[in-house]
Amino acid sequence: MEKAKDSLPTTGDPVPSQGTINPVDETGGSASDEKKAKKGCDFWFTFSSLVLTAFLSALEGSVVSTALPTIARALEASENYVWVVNVYYLSKYETWLTYLLRFSSAAFQPIYGQLADLWGRRWLTIGAVVIFTVGSGICGGATSIDMLIGGRAIQGLGSAGINMLVELILCDLLPLRERGQFFGIIFMFVILGSVIGPFLGGILVDRVSWRWVFYINIPFSGVCVVLLFFFLHIKNAGTGNFIDKVKRIDFFGNFLLAASVGSCLFALTYGDTRYPFSDTRIIVSLVLGLLGHVAFMFFEASPWCKEPVMPMVLFKNRTSAGAYIATFLQTLVSFWVLYFLPLYFQSTQLVSATRSGVMLLPFSVVYALSSLAGGALTTKLGRFRNIHFASFALMTIGMGTLTILNRSTSLAVIVVLEMIVALAIGVPTANLLTAIQAALPDELNALSTGTFAFLRSVGTIWGVSIPAAIFNNRFDQLLPELSDPTAVRALQRGGAYQQATSEFVDSFPSDVRDVIISIYERSLERVWQIGIVFAGVGFLVIFLERDLKLGTQKKTEDIEINDIPQTAADNSASRPNTINDTASQAPILKQRRSTNQERETV
């Protein structure tokens, strides 16, 4: 591993993979790029099962929201009902893992990439779907809140693997240039699942039973398992016996990363809400979290870490490093908007929660469609850098336009602004992973995908925590303008976020109500202003990327799906399976161009 860290280049040039090289034309593509192989039944059955599993995973993240009150009453959950939501995302996103008493396992999101290299994709994917299905069954049959929480934890563990492995398998099956359009389809269904979840949950609770919020996954997940078993055949497991493989897992790195993220999020979540930011617990948590991240990076790059779960070589290439940062910022901004637009609708426009969901539909629909369009555009052009430039530029402008929102903004203006921001956020969603892998060798696909999924997950949570902290801090600064003591007590120290409903605001006299709305308007304005900075940093980060040409050929020596094209890999005796093998080939690889990773001078 030490050789790998030292041997792989630290420049902006991608590291080509080993294989027979097709003639390269003057545009950087191979002469055979124009001919695309047709995809047969094996591929489409596999892809359909991946789409369905990703959709179900996203659906379960939101479907419970409208069913929670009914579930809480049925199981007499009282205040514990919140864990039904939190426990799902804890195991999935590795944030509060260190605080979750019911979990003793290590962090799962990044480690799935390492497990995929050691044991292969096929059985790991089937196992993740089975775990998700078992968790759904436990939740549906729950007779106590503790049983329900345990089932949600199991669901979350399965969902963590599904989200990462779906993307990784597509990387195995498709050349770089074709990945964008298929990622676009996947993300469109993921967004669709997140959007329709609350509506479906309400219908199932009203018409059938809250238990079918969970039972509905079982038949569809069963179909996915059958399809994956018969049609997904990828042989890329590592060598060695079970004990040897277990020894290669980066347990300490995973633990250190989870603890660091959890410590930072504790400070962001409870700072200025439960405790003031000057409180020792908040300061210590934030400092320990930041130091933990630094320690994690040093450990991953050190000789003590033989098999890093997040090797620093992923970030030594300027294109992959820039795309990773852009991934984090794009996800952060998307949830920044997704969570605070509804708050604006209810606290300032004074609409109901149901009406707020309807008003958010333009954002959700355009977000899904633009994700699909962005992936297709990447496949069409064979490049990604200019797409990222345009997207983040529009994202920065879009966040700026949100600062004009107030109580008198018309619905037409709101819809237009939503669509602008959604278009900007959605277009790069399906091609950021492609940009990362265009600059890295295929041997790093699993680890690069695991890191991509982790940064996206962290961006999801920070995209809520950071603007919430900004909002609460600004609201408390403006709160002295409010003279009503009842309103002050309800709104201070984080209460403003919880009380952002039309019912609460309308419960006060008109003069007090006007002041409350004004404070909400100015607090949200600060949220959008800081959001401009994050989007702007994303635009600047794109300058790190090189304008790489995406190839249309895929080496398939490890893939048994018959309709996947056989190209340069047919003449390759063996492909390096470990980073060390890749490093040993580095002097040769630097002199060659891969069929799907061509270098270009920008």
From Swiss-Prot:
It is found in: Cell membrane. It is a multi-pass membrane protein. GO terms for cellular component: plasma membrane. Its main location: membrane. The keyword Chloroplast does not apply. Pfam families: MFS_1. The chain crosses the membrane at residues 43-63, 123-143, 156-176, 185-205, 212-232, 251-271, 282-302, 325-345, 357-377, 386-406, 410-430, 451-471, 524-544. Residues 564-585 have a biased composition (Polar residues). The keyword Glycoprotein applies. Belongs to the major facilitator superfamily. MFS-type efflux transporter; part of the gene cluster that mediates the biosynthesis of the mycotoxin pyrichalasin H, a tyrosine-derived cytochalasan that inhibits the growth of rice seedlings, but also inhibits lymphocyte capping and actin polymerization and alters cell morphology. Pyrichalasin H is indicated as the responsible agent for the genus-specific pathogenicity of M.grisea toward crabgrass. PyiT might be involved in the excretion of pyrichalasin H. This is MFS-type efflux transporter pyiT. It comes from Pyricularia grisea. The lineage of its organism: Eukaryota, Fungi, Dikarya, Ascomycota, Pezizomycotina. The gene is pyiT.
